[in-house]
């Protein structure tokens, strides 16, 4: 199972590194303009807006791009602790993405990719959690005698 978990981790890491790079570096003019327009919408419904903070759309896009790029790279080549931290950060990011798309009342087909990524990241996190706790929970070596009734 650890091989499959490793493959999932690498695939997710490469995916997020590429999507982060696409947000940071101008791929093509139409794609960059479309992404800028999307982040203008995303900034309008930013979850912290209720507390008076609304990010600049370009800064928002840049921050998300760097987070995806760095967390994706750390998922692939980072030490285990940084892989787990990166996974948690990406889970939070994908939760925010799903929230944003739901608030914008986008069609289901728009937020399915973010929901699938969120599910895969949660699966990866669960596998890491189970691997950590597997050694911590051990069966007792002595048999426990059955309780006798009074």
Swiss-Prot record:
It is found in: Membrane. The chain crosses the membrane at residues 62-82, 84-104, 111-131. Belongs to the DoxX family. This is Transmembrane protein 35B. InterPro entries: DoxX, TMEM35A/B. GO terms for cellular component: membrane. Pfam families: DoxX_2 (PF13564). Residues 1-21 form the signal peptide. It is a multi-pass membrane protein. It comes from the Eukaryota. Keywords: Membrane, Signal, Transmembrane, Transmembrane helix.
């Amino acid at each position: 199972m650890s091989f499959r978990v490793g493959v999932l981790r690498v695939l997710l890491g490469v995916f997020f590194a590429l999507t982060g790079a696409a947000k940071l570096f101008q791929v093509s003019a139409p794609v960059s303009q479309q992404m800028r327009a999307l982040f203008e919408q995303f900034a309008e419904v930013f979850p912290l807006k209720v507390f008076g903070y609304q990010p600049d759309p370009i800064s928002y896009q840049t921050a998300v791009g760097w987070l995806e790029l760095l967390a994706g790279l750390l998922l692939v080549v980072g030490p285990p602790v940084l892989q787990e931290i990166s996974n948690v950060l990406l889970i939070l990011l994908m939760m925010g993405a799903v929230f944003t798309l739901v608030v914008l009342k986008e069609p289901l087909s728009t937020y399915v990719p973010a929901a699938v990524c969120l599910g895969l990241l949660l699966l990866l996190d669960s596998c890491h959690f189970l691997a950590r706790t597997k050694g911590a929970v051990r069966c007792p070596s002595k048999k426990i005698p059955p309780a006798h009734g009074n």
